[in-house]
């Protein structure tokens, strides 16, 4: 987590961020992380009781975050799944920003910082053609795996890549 925070230091200064923690793992840390990045955080579904994980909350019920962001006039929102290995974002209008767009944003950012190892992002065969076109325009290479974060991770380890993920919101970073 510390590594990710160094990549995004001060990048959320004064940004109004909604967080849907799905009453799961993110409940313990998400607010602290975004606060440390300078965000003004607004949190929902962060009271796990052992039974309510993912219950009408988080990335599998994105409409909850969409409404929360719009009703509170927030700048952006992030919804995690119960074990916090998946993240879906919404913009200020509640429009979904899926894993492909998140990969694009981080891939571009890492390339601009000279930190995109092997100039490559790992995706799955389910990624959108628009993502590949955008990577081509930026001169970023990509490798496609079978669907499943397991396969993305295996490719990253085998080939030494820094970032990979799925359209579903599983995003994986390595040092």
Task: Show which residues each predicted segment covers.
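Gly/Ser/Thr-enriched, mixed-charge loops and adjacent short helices
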Residues: 1-70
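Buried hydrophobic positions in well-ordered alpha/beta secondary-structure cores of metabolic enzymes
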Residues: 4, 20, 62-65, 78, ...
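Short, glycine/acidic-enriched loop or turn micro-motifs at the edges of active sites
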Residues: 23, 82-86, 94, 169
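Short acidic, glycine/serine/threonine-rich loops at helix termini
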Residues: 28-32, 55-57, 87-92, 131-137, ...
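Active-site microenvironments of hydrolase-like enzyme catalytic domains
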Residues: 80-91, 162-164
């Amino acid at each position: 987590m510390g590594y990710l925070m160094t990549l995004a230091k001060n990048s959320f200064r004064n940004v109004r961020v909604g967080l849907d923690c799905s009453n799961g793992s993110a409940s313990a840390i998400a607010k602290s992380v975004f606060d440390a990045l300078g965000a003004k955080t607004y949190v929902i579904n962060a009271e796990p009781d052992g039974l309510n994980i993912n219950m009408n909350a988080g990335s599998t019920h994105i409409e909850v975050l969409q409404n929360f962001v719009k009703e509170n006039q927030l700048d952006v929102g992030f919804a995690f799944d119960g074990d916090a290995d998946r993240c879906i974002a919404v913009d200020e209008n509640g429009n979904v920003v899926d894993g492909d767009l998140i990969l694009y944003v981080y891939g571009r950012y890492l390339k601009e910082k000279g930190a995109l190892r092997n100039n490559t992002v790992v995706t799955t065969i389910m990624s959108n053609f628009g993502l590949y076109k955008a990577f081509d325009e930026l001169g970023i290479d990509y490798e496609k795996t079978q669907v499943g974060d397991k396969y993305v991770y295996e490719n990253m380890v085998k080939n030494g890549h820094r970032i990979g993920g799925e359209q579903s919101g599983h995003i994986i970073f390595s040092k």
